[in-house]
Amino acid sequence: MSEHKDISPPKLIKDRGSLHPINHMKDSIMNLLISFGFEIVDGPEIETEEFNFDMLNIKKSHPARQMHDTFYVENKSKLLRTHTSPVQIRGMLKKKPPLAFISGGKVYRKDDDATHLPMFHQVEGIYVDENVSFAQLKDLIYKIIYSLFGEDVELRFRPSYFPFTEPSAEVDILSKEGKWLEILGCG
């Protein structure tokens, strides 16, 4: 007795799911910045020390360059990028100011605790022109935060240090539980 096989095409599935919340947030940020005139640039997840550290003024003695903080591959000749900043460097090597770039993607650090994971997503922008001020950067950040979370969100800027920006700050938003949550660094 022969077995009959159904060779008809599969039924179309109407609801195929939805965008992951991380991708939704990344797309929202990127689309907002595109509306402000930023251009999307992309770069590799496997980087060299030159682009990931050296060109960003991160000294050889900096703790972030140690094996316990960075995922090195290929006999330590390459690494999984620890931030999306190398993408900006690559963009600046290709285009002269004025320029406005954004990039988004996965980054990797040897962090694993209640508030950190070894892989996370980052969106980063750079704007280079004459007569650009920190006040303009703050205004842009307020516009982004209010667009994403509403104008009733409370935020604060805290002075910080990043080897590749001066001045630098970290930005926190106040959670519904009354705790400050760091959401970005800038400079």
Model-flagged regions — what are they?
Residues S2-G187:
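TRNA-recognition modules of translation machinery and tRNA-sensing kinases, especially anticodon-binding
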